[in-house]
Regions:
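Active-site proximal beta-strand in glycosyltransferases
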Residues: 91-92, 108-131
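Donor nucleotide-sugar binding/catalytic pocket of nucleotide-sugar-dependent glycosyltransferases
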Residues: 51, 114, 141-191
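A charged, aromatic-enriched C-terminal amphipathic alpha-helix characteristic of glycosyltransferases
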Residues: 76, 333-365
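Short hydrophobic beta-strand element within catalytic cores of glycosyltransferases
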Residues: 288-294, 298-302
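Conserved catalytic-core segment of nucleotide-activated headgroup transferases in glycan assembly
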Residues: 16, 181-250, 255-270
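Membrane-proximal helix-turn-helix segments that form the acceptor-binding/catalytic region
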Residues: 79-86, 121-124, 132-161
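Acidic donor-binding loop of glycosyltransferase active sites
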Residues: 269-284, 295-297
């Protein structure tokens, strides 16, 4: 049961859903995919990851804002979903706390149910409230954080909780039984493209309409300007607002590529001198970090990006604009041997083998 339509797999949460479904289908499982759709469309070919696909609309009732149930849960309360789940006896995977509205329903009490936890939701929303400049958004994030923390008790109805990072595993293990760490599994790595050589550039990529990413871009722009960093910075991603577009246009060594195609983004990631993965809020594991590491390129990150991930030794960790400038001015990219070592370790850490073991043990073994 997915909180969003997992296509295209172009942001963290849906990437995890998409590649996990593909791994399970390739392993011989029959996948019935239930998606809450609210803007990503319903005309997708999911034959590579699912055998059956059903779509549901998120509730838009004003009552959801004032419910004791978290908004992200209350708006995914489809009775059509419950009816379909009751048509068989198959195990169920609920994606995130978002999709747990029916987790404790009495008619599902005998089913094997796993909740895939993409982060500690209440902490994520609490962090958003501290960083937002909007009064309404701060109120909403604070309210949602309180509701999500209370709502965690519903997770006791799950057969197993599958966490995405080591630090999240520690948190949930202290509160629940049957918590198991299941890293993101990428068995098939992106193929190398034949691309023309580029002048050296540093890449920041992400969904630019997300406040956290927009904040990171503005931090980078200020760092490049104040530290007089001469190298080229490319900002690539979806739906930048006009403020960000204007800010990028005011610096001659900064190029903004809005809404690049998947192929163009892949080309940028494989030809960048290094990836700049900047963020100021820890949550789960940043899948764009894994994507960057899989290119075999150097990754320069802030501490929050790698906190609890066990990946800090594969990255260059910086905390200040001065440290960023020092690293960029040295222009030391990874050697071929360092790149090969990085790729080998990422493949080992994020193999799909762990996923298949956990699914078999918790959802199918008696």
């Amino acid at each position: 049961v997915a909180f969003d339509v997992p296509f295209p797999p172009d942001y963290g949460g849906v990437m995890d859903v998409y590649y996990r479904c593909r791994s399970l289908k390739n392993a011989g499982y029959h996948i019935i995919l239930h998606c809450f759709e609210y803007g990503r469309g319903r005309m997708h070919d999911f034959s590579a990851i699912a055998d059956e696909v059903y779509y549901y609309t998120r509730s838009k009732s004003l009552l959801s804002w004032f419910s004791k149930t978290p908004f992200i849960v209350a708006t995914r309360n489809s009775t059509a979903l419950l009816k379909r789940l009751l048509q068989d006896k198959h195990p169920i995977v609920f994606e995130g706390q978002h999709c747990t509205f029916w987790l404790h329903h009495p008619e599902l009490s005998q089913r094997k149910k796993m909740v895939r936890l993409h982060n500690i939701e209440w902490q994520y929303y609490e962090g958003l409230s501290k960083r937002s400049n909007s009064f309404f958004k701060r109120w909403y994030f604070q309210s949602e954080a309180r509701k999500l923390k209370r709502h965690e008790e519903t997770l006791n109805y799950a057969t197993a909780l599958a966490t995405i990072s080591a630090s999240d595993t520690d948190y949930y293990t202290s509160r629940f039984e049957n918590v198991v760490y299941v890293p993101v599994g990428f068995e098939q790595f992106p193929p190398k493209l034949r691309v023309k050589s580029h002048d050296p550039f540093y890449l920041f990529q992400g969904n630019l309409s997300v406040e956290e990413n927009s904040e990171a871009v503005h931090w980078l722009l200020e760092a490049f300007r104040k530290q007089s960093i001469p190298q080229t910075l490319i900002i690539a991603g979806k739906n930048p607002d006009q403020v960000l577009v204007t800010a990028c246009s005011q610096q001659t060594n900064v190029q903004l590529i809005a809404n690049p195609s998947d192929l163009r983004m892949q080309e940028l990631m494989q030809t960048a001198t290094a990836h700049l993965i900047i963020g100021f809020q820890h949550s789960g594991i940043k899948l764009k970090l894994l994507n960057a590491l899989m290119t075999g390129k150097k990754c320069i990150v802030t501490p929050e990006i790698v906190a609890g991930s066990g990946l800090d030794h594969l990255c260059t960790v910086i905390s200040t604009p001065e440290e960023l400038a020092q690293n960029l001015l040295s222009e030391n990219s990874l050697s071929e041997q360092e790149s090969a070592t990085q790729l080998a370790e990422v493949r080992e850490l994020f193999s799909e083998k762990r996923l298949l073991e956990v699914v078999r043990k918790y959802l199918f073994d008696d």
